[in-house]
Amino acid sequence: MRMSDTVTVKDETATMKDLEAEVKDTTRVENLIKSENYGKILVEKNEHCIENNIDLQRPLQSFGQTGKRSKSSSKLKLVRSLAVCEESPPPPAPEISQENQEKIQIQLTQSFEKEEKPSKDEAEKEKASDKLPRKMLSRDSSQEYTDSTGIDLHEFLVNTLKNNPRDRMMLLKLEQEILDFIGNNESPRKKFPPMTSYHRMLLHRVAAYFGLDHNVDQSGKSVIVNKTSNTRIPDQKFNEHIKDDKGEDFQKRYILKRDNSSFDKDDNQMRIRLKDDRRSKSIEEREEEYQRARDRIFSQDSLCSQENYIIDKRLQDEDASSTQQRRQIFRVNKDASGRSTNSHQSSTENELKYSEPRPWSSTDSDSSLRNLKPAVTKASSFSGISVLTRGDSSGSSKSIGRLSKTGSESSGSVGSSTGSLSHIQQPLPGTALSQSSHGAPVVYPTVSTHSSLSFDGGLNGQVASPSTSFFLLPLEAAGIPPGSILINPQTGQPFINPDGSPVVYNPPMTQQPVRSQVPGPPQPPLPAPPQQPAANHIFSQDNLGSQFSHMSLARQPSADGSDPHAAMFQSTVVLQSPQQSGYIMTAAPPPHPPPPPPPPPPPPPLPPGQPVPTAGYPASGHPVSQPVLQQQGYIQQPSPQMPACYCAPGHYHSSQPQYRPVPSVHYNSHLNQPLPQPAQQTGYQVIPNQQQNYQGIVGVQQPQSQSLVSGQPNSIGNQIQGVVIPYTSVPTYQVSLPQGSQGIPHQTYQQPVMFPNQSNQGSMPTTGMPVYYSVIPPGQQNNLSSSVGYLQHPGSEQVQFPRTTSPCSSQQLQGHQCTAGPPPPPGGGMVMMQLSVPNNPQSCAHSPPQWKQNKYYCDHQRGQKCVEFSSVDNIVQHSPQLSSPIISPAQSPAPAQLSTLKTVRPSGPPLSIMPQFSRPFVPGQGDSRYPLLGQPLQYNPPAVLHGHIPNQQGQPGSRHGNRGRRQAKKAASTDLGAGETVVGKVLEITELPDGITRMEAEKLFGELFKIGAKIRWLRDPQSQPRRHPLCCGSGDNTANPERSKPSDLASTYTVLATFPSISAAQNALKKQINSVNKFKLRTSKKHYDFHILERASSQ
């Protein structure tokens, strides 16, 4: 229903006249009814006139609200009153009613004029005022206000409701409020809250549409509406317009959609059908696509005529297990290579793992694509560790078969991890560069076993001999019973040694033969070209360390016992980086002589014209028949920037199951990359004593900075690890290794610092003398600060470092005179010794340095990082027994879990390994992805030192009569890893007053003394004078008279409070919150050995 735009005033006036006539008739009818009911009233006409006036005013008052109802009812009454009017004419009351009606209308007009605000158009206002006598005022005002703009209200509202969702909500809200206002008879006017001009315009139009009078208040922000006689409720609500619009649009869309879909209806059905088929056959189709992709990839590679082999191999591997395995290899290889281009080559070479090896050729190079080199798996779990093999030792950096095209052969990132290797491949014999004149070279045959890594090392000058072999076992090997045959978990077949016999697992402590072996016949050492230093790189892989959390390298000595040291020494090397996986390398004991199988064929000699490497180190007085066991556990790193795996002799019981995976050790070698200056690596290895068995371990740790040894000046002090070697009670010496000029390229030291045997150097420390080797931070020394403390007899004041010959170079390490200071005082003073070692360029693999029997490792990189490793001597003489295991603390940047290292006998002190802090990565060390490039393999200690350390744990000086000195007090501290809970009784005292001395500070600790706490003073290494560097110095008052000076500042010490119990330490922490002290207690960020802290007590 649409309302007309305008209603003329003429029509309105005629309507009013009709209404007035109807009111008159109604009055007559009412008079007749009253006359019938009340006969007395009919006689008295005057009373009739009064009643007529009253009745006339009553309908006029209610006219504005009940116009239609009065009209309809008057019509009904009009029909009844016609006949009655004929008989009794009406009295002259209409005249009076007209006068009263005009008076009432005049009053209403005046009231409307007062409430209505003057319009903007004055002409329209005057026009409206002229029409006032025509009896319709409020209707005119609303229509004139809205119609002046020429807006069709109905059309405007309908379009707004359909097209503008935001205005639609506003209109619906206004509609509801106006409906509520109209339905409420109590309030004639309503004032809306202030709103914007656009919303006020909407409100004006909605009010006009409802027949309301609408104006704004004095502020001009709010709209006021008033009820009028024309107020109405439209027949259609706003919602109905919206519904109609949606219905029409929906119908239109439906029609368009049906028309458009008629063209591609068949295509859509086909697509849906294809999707359904694909959904039901996804597995089968993937298998087919996978096979087709492999066929296509392999068909592209026509080198070495591999097509026929691939076809035959695919036919053999049709079974489900082979398919699953190859899918896994392909998937892992794709993830490891990281490039789609790499997956082609690496997948091809993975398939070649199953082929039989072709004869080795010294002419093999990268261009020949020796794909039958076994790949190095990237084991996502520790269930399978595949082989790491070396194909040849010719010195050619390209001799290693490419596992994936990494884009740069010089980067040495050879090999993308290719999943699990299950094929047992026969070894490719190879030679290693000579380690020393009497050391056995390390030979790495390509024994492609899944969970074991086999390294063969023979005597110097021998070819690949099965006399010694190393097997890399995963963490699960710790729980394997002795004598078990190692079985490949992927194929279910036992691992095969190079000689064809199954691999039998025997822990180092057992005396059972691992496999029947005979030493190979001695042969002259094969020449190795110095110009190809990267020939013998061992591991070349992007992320090798993630597979080897703990690499166990077990050495099996020769069966006939020709090696005098094989029966006494075992090698232990812990390889571990902060956030990667590590393994323990252990050496197997000499087996009983079994029936000797034929040894593998020796490798062919290298091309002539290449120099033969000379002996790396002299025998130090040992006869040639008794070669010094330098080769034990030593992995040769011929690459200039390859790390050295230092394996010092020692015992390790492989049945301990406490190993935990730690961040991986990355290996990398720069292949065919000429260096501006040949790199050197400082190696540390001990020459075993002829008469004693010992336990040794090299703690080579890789920090988060991915760098250990750096050739950059002012940074090597942060790079080199410390080594502590126990000897007899003698003063400590300071050895400084200067770095050289600033312009030297980044190098790694391959020329080791050699400590010859006592038989050759009378001035060297005698047997049993503790030698402390540590590193002073770069802040104290500008050059390489490698402090070696020799506890030597007072009479010996010089240590002659003999000339040593690099294995692969004619250059020799010049003999260095280590001149000691004045003789040690009788009270046990420190005598400093300076050792200057220049940077001799070495282009070959570094030779292992030589040490004495008992070894301690002290890391003074940041002061309190000294760790002592208790010596275990005479292992063969004493019955080996396992004592309580020790878990050394984790490295602070990244705590890593390491298994416990058990000592050989309970009476001997346990072996504890402490970490070193992270160091920044030095440019020039190689790619940052390969953290061990150009540096020794790292050792990362375990997370928590569990406190069940035997009482024998003490400083080495106490074992050798050096009880007067307390050099190793700070050896018991090490950083705790992030997130570790401190379990102990030691709290650190911090926030002491500035400038306070040590004696004054002790007076402040009265409250702590009352509860039984003991104060330990550990000197800060940064605060020590450079001319008095202490390897493992303590802060005891009795250790050094200098310590007790009144001017000794407390800020130069790390103050620790040891409480009698953990609860007492916790109570002290709680009490300090409420008490006002001049110091603060906090849980120490380091772990401290209580037995060694006892010597640092100030009480």
Curated annotation (Swiss-Prot):
Sequence ranges of Basic residues compositional bias: 960-969
UniProt biased composition (Low complexity): 391-422
Modified residue annotations for Asymmetric dimethylarginine: 929
Residues where Omega-N-methylarginine is found: 929
Location of the SUZ domain: 232-302
Molecular function per GO: RNA binding
Pro residues: compositionally biased ranges: 519-532, 588-611
Keywords: Methylation, Phosphoprotein
CDD domains in UniProt: R3H_encore_like (cd02642)
Composition bias type Polar residues, residue spans: 338-349, 360-370, 797-817
Any Pfam family the entry gives: SUZ
Biased composition (Basic and acidic residues): 112-142
The protein's name: R3H domain-containing protein 1
Gene, per the UniProt record: R3HDM1
